[in-house]
Regions:
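Catalytic phosphate/metal-binding cores of nucleic-acid and nucleotide-processing enzymes, i.e., regions
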Residues: 1-56
Length: 56
């Protein structure tokens, strides 16, 4: 599944927690999390603070 497809699945509520965390780790690693709507950057930082994902 491409990042775009996974983002659409996320926005449609179709991803479970593990898939959501994997998506946000991928978005952070690629830098895309900071270029999308503010929600993505804020959610990424929440996941970092909670220890679910790491900054590259």
């Amino acid at each position: 599944m491409t990042s775009f497809t996974r983002i659409l699945a996320y926005e449609n509520g179709e991803l479970d927690l593990d898939d959501t965390i994997a998506l946000f780790q991928e978005l952070v690693n690629s830098g895309i999390a900071w270029e999308l709507q503010g929600h993505y950057g804020r959610t990424a930082m929440e996941f970092v603070r909670a220890g679910y994902i790491t900054l590259p």
